[in-house]
């Protein structure tokens, strides 16, 4: 299950990067994007970037949700391992105490 969420998160992150880079530039440095407006007419014809912004919003939401899920799964794995380590340490300490008590008896 952890592997599924991890692969899906990687897919969402690459999709977000691709969609963000696909947007047409409207800022200060438009000289880089000379002919990109003609290449991506599908995204520009729907509206003033509304379609691609909605897709990016959905992918960003999925990214947030899946990263929280992965953090919770990873946290549960770490906490369960910590509890197992503490229990084994307690058992070894108790066994050592019992051995000391058994070995401390002197025959009369």
Curated annotation (Swiss-Prot):
GO cellular component: plasma membrane
Key words, A-Z: Cell membrane, Membrane, Protein transport, Translocation, Transmembrane, Transmembrane helix, Transport
GO biological process, one term: intracellular protein transmembrane transport
Record-linked InterPro entries: SecG
Transmembrane segments: 2-22, 51-71
Keyword Transmembrane: yes
Membrane topology summary: Multi-pass membrane protein
Subcellular location: Cell membrane
A Pfam family reported for this protein in Swiss-Prot or TrEMBL: SecG
GO molecular function terms attached to this record: protein-transporting ATPase activity
The UniProt record lists the keyword Secreted: no
Complex and partners: Part of the prokaryotic protein translocation apparatus which comprise SecA, SecB, SecE, SecF, SecG and SecY.
Function as written in the Swiss-Prot or TrEMBL entry: Involved in protein export. Participates in an early event of protein translocation.
Family to which the UniProt record says this protein belongs: Belongs to the SecG family.
Protein name, entry field: Protein-export membrane protein SecG
Species per Swiss-Prot/TrEMBL record: Buchnera aphidicola subsp. Schizaphis graminum (strain Sg)
Taxon lineage: Bacteria, Pseudomonadati, Pseudomonadota, Gammaproteobacteria, Enterobacterales
Gene (UniProt): secG
């Amino acid at each position: 299950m952890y592997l599924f969420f991890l692969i899906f998160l990687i897919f969402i992150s690459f999709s977000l990067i691709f969609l963000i880079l696909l947007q047409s530039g409207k800022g200060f440095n438009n000289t880089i994007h000379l002919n990109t407006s003609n290449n991506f007419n599908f995204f520009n014809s729907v509206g003033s970037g509304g379609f691609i912004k909605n897709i990016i919003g959905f992918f960003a939401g999925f990214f947030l949700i899946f990263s929280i899920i992965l953090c919770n799964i990873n946290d549960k794995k770490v906490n369960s391992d910590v509890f197992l380590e503490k229990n084994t340490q307690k058992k070894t300490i108790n066994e050592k105490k019992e051995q000391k008590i058994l070995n401390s008896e002197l025959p009369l």
